[in-house]
Amino acid sequence: MEAIKQIRPQAEMRYREELDALAAADAENRRPLGWKLSPRAVRDFILGRSKPLEYQGRQVTITKKYLGNDALVERCIITLTGSRGLMLVGDPGTAKTMLSELLSAAISGVSTNTVQGTAGTTEDMIKYSWNYALLLAQGPSRQALVPSPLYTGMERGILTRFEEITRT
């Protein structure tokens, strides 16, 4: 049987070595509760560094991944340090999804916790829903609950990305 090929791996997999090198170099720096990297290291991950980092006996270059406005990235990071929501608004093709994926990978270590908005997105897709067979058999229980990405984000303390929120 042929293995399934991924079109594009998640940011945390694609840039694993860079994230690991930044985490090792960043170990002494302060970071907001639940963050994998300090705000400075998150900035370096997205906007790149001029000097490579020494990691496991090798030089690791932190590449620039976002080719837009550096000040925008810094404002996004500052907003997220305050435990506030961040909404990126712009024309199609302006790297909003890419930036949110990079921020999630650097801050939470997970970029796939996403609610995909559509015209058919319902409240239970955002909060949680129930496995009705288990609900009838056991009553309301944790096993019968089907967590949404938002529920998972709140439970694990990771970022939740909403894609195409205007289409809901």
Q: Where are each of the predicted segments found?
A:
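AAA+ P-loop NTPase catalytic core and its hallmark functional loops
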Residues: 2-168
